[in-house]
Amino acid sequence: MSVPQDVSIFTAYNANVDAITKLNGETIQKLINEFGEKEIAERIEEYPREIREPIDFVARLIHALRLGKPTAVPLVDESLNSWFDEKFEYELERLGGQAGIIANVLAGLGIKKVIAYTPFLPKRLADLFKEGVLYPTVENGELKLKPIREAYRDEDPLKINRIFEFRKGTKFKFLGESVEVPASGRFIVSARFESISKIETKEELRPFLDDIGKEVDGAIFSGYQGLRLKYSDGKDANYYLRRAKEDIISLKEEDVKVHVELASIQDRKLRKKVITNILPIADSVGIDEAEIAQLLSVLGYRDLADRIFTYNRLEDSILGGMIILDELNFEILQVHTIYYLMYITHRDNPLSEEELMKSLEFGTTLAAARASLGDINRPEDYEIGLKVPFNERSEYVKLRFEEAKTKLRMREYKVVVIPTRLVPNPVLTVGLGDTISAGAFITYVNYLKRH
């Protein structure tokens, strides 16, 4: 399949600086020795859900390393920025945040037009976007699309997320035993300060969203996990979600297909607000299997959610996906997991199952190329992904899917499941789910244009 270059996409809202540190056994051991095994073990028991002091970070990190499990924990105390900057050296800074990552991947692919919007654009962030990415501004009462690197505002706040990458096989001692990290992954300390948590389109740009809609075929929205329930100025999540809905509606009035890339939302109340406000007006929604369970739990399907959390069976995920699609009534659900990708849509979707399959294959191939190279800089880079084999559980995935078809009533749906291409030693792991979603969505939109 070739790169669908005749597609134009708008992405919003979240982009940030990712500062990356590669962890080794020595660094981990130093942290354990500094904070004390007993104190760390006690804090692991308490299981802090956010980082308010350094030991919260160390406890959650050690817990994640023992399980070999990718984890993200919000940092809520802005004053800890200096502690992290003094304690760790960053190997590199790159663009993070779903909207930012997706904009750069699509610009690298050379699609027709990429417009990225984030409410905060300090220079340090703007410089990390690729050439070719445009930013919407208003000049003399008109919409002007400027190269994003030139559109920065010095006074804007900076969001920096710290990513601690760990490798399978890294060893350290904890509580008298030798621990070997069972799988590679990353531990993300995500900045969640109030100054950067107002997810919105700024007032002066809002009247021009329909003009942006005329420029693009599709829009990818993300970043709602950064919202707060309450703000010190009296506003709340409902205020920002109302505005976010208006943004989506403005674009849909111009026949723009809207994809929402969901991310894990720790706060149950906020999760429910985002799910019930935003997802029903989207066309396409991208999630992973943990988020299937979170969605089902919000929608009242606790038993099925628990089954997915506990057993992680494909047939449960398919059943859960069909329920989500029906309850929230959007067009297509896209699920990305480490071993398989899945589309669930209603039977009347204009795309054939073969086209849906090709769309997912484009997504996993693009992600494999990015994992192999570390970045997508030109359309030909996509072809590197074609050399990456499908993962070792491919046959098992196919078998499980065939079994699920015999057990579930799927007549009213089109369900497509494909195995993922898995790079054994990835140069990069951050944002691969977003890359899959972006690749799948642009091919989906491209097929719809043909129909």
Curated annotation (Swiss-Prot):
Residues 1-450 form the ADPK domain. The active site is at D434 (proton acceptor). Mg(2+) binds at E261, E291, D434. The keyword Metal-binding applies. It is an enzyme of class 2 (transferase). One of its GO terms (molecular function) is ADP-specific phosphofructokinase activity. GO terms for biological process: fructose metabolic process; glycolytic process. It is found in: Cytoplasm. Keywords: Cytoplasm, Glycolysis, Kinase, Magnesium, Metal-binding, Transferase. Its EC number is 2.7.1.146. PANTHER family: ADP-DEPENDENT GLUCOKINASE. NCBIfam families: P_fruct_ADP (TIGR02045). This is ADP-specific phosphofructokinase. It comes from Pyrococcus abyssi (strain GE5 / Orsay).
